[in-house]
């Protein structure tokens, strides 16, 4: 059934690692609000959130992974999704699952020119269960692009409606529908 994650994962509460995109998901972003509701969750830290360099961001993600006591669920937004795809090809640390929200197209006109090294986007399957979530009016990446990434990565796919870039500007608050998708990803 389209929209329903089909991967199985281990039961029980696990760690989560928030992987923001450019700008580090500010105070009104659902990633930040989720993290505030779950004090045990952690966030990747990057040296420069406004001028991302993929090679540097890879090391930031890997350093955060090294500090965790168990395989986490990765909760990525925008450029964080591209980072997860690159990291999955570069590193071998275990991951429970990944929620990949609003995948941007690096060849699109809205992709930040300050971002370096995110192209080409890996087209190999991820080695962990994953779900790509897209919006039908995301200015940074079309549904068709997100669907292609999901197919390349072996990810399940959900089109979440007309909710922009699925960020604070979308007015989602703590995005309850996203939490439902995360819970379904982890339970199936």
PLM ranges: what are they?
Residues 86-97:
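Conserved hydrolase catalytic core segment
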Residues 168-184:
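Post-His helix in hydrolase/transferase enzymes
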Residues 21, 46-49, 99-108, 135:
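Active-site nucleophile loop of the alpha/beta-hydrolase fold
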Residues 126, 131-134, 138:
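Short beta-strand/loop motif that positions the catalytic acidic residue
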Residues 24-25, 136-141:
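Acidic catalytic loop of the alpha/beta-hydrolase fold
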Residues 74-85:
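Gly/Ala-rich beta-loop-alpha elbow adjacent to hydrolase catalytic centers
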Residues 40-42, 151-167:
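Catalytic histidine neighborhood in serine/cysteine hydrolases
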Residues 6-70:
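Active-site catalytic motif of lipid deacylating hydrolases and related acyltransferases
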